[in-house]
Amino acid sequence: MDKDDLTHFNDEKRAKMVDVTSKSETKRRAIARATIHMNEETLARIHAGKIAKGDVLAVAQVAGIMAAKKTSELIPMCHPIMTTKADISFDDDGKTALTITSEVVTVGKTGVEMEALTAVTIAALTIYDMCKAMDKGMQIEKTYLVEKTGGKSGTFKAEA
């Protein structure tokens, strides 16, 4: 991408919020994913409900949903949007890896990629926070946009 194609800079090369006034409202959807690696015992205790701070996945799910709704307060040039759907799901390998997936939907003038990415990131950080007393070596990695639909740029799907 050419630097002239970047939309978050004004003529003086300073940051600006993109003007979406004339864009049409369309359905926009984004899916993001992140993985947190931990000790086998940590994952087993999460599933058994034996983490002192409470139900890790329930709290992380709520944190991720809240994060999707608050993204514009965290990312400076991100537009405030009306989120019409935010969902967080979890999958694991039964050993040491817990994968977090978010789906965020809106009908609006701008996409929800940042909301989906923020949701999985905050969900992963919440898991870390709730389990750090027993496993400080957890690693959050491979946070990425899986898919996005809607808007001028159309559909994007990450390569498998």
Curated annotation (Swiss-Prot):
One Pfam entry name: MoaC
SUPFAM superfamilies with a match to the protein in the record: Molybdenum cofactor biosynthesis protein C, MoaC
UniProt pathway: Cofactor biosynthesis; molybdopterin biosynthesis
Active site: 129
Annotated keywords: Lyase, Molybdenum cofactor biosynthesis
Any one GO molecular function term: cyclic pyranopterin monophosphate synthase activity
Biological processes annotated in GO: Mo-molybdopterin cofactor biosynthetic process
Catalyzed reactions: (8S)-3',8-cyclo-7,8-dihydroguanosine 5'-triphosphate = cyclic pyranopterin phosphate + diphosphate
InterPro entries reported for this sequence: MoaC, MoaC_bact/euk, MoaC_sf, MoCo_biosynth_MoaA/MoaC, Mopterin_CF_biosynth-C_dom
EC numbers on record: 4.6.1.17
Residues binding substrate, per UniProt: 77-79, 114-115
Description of how the protein assembles with itself and partners: Homohexamer; trimer of dimers.
Family note: Belongs to the MoaC family.
Function statement: Catalyzes the conversion of (8S)-3',8-cyclo-7,8-dihydroguanosine 5'-triphosphate to cyclic pyranopterin monophosphate (cPMP).
Entry protein name: Cyclic pyranopterin monophosphate synthase
Species, as recorded: Listeria innocua serovar 6a (strain ATCC BAA-680 / CLIP 11262)
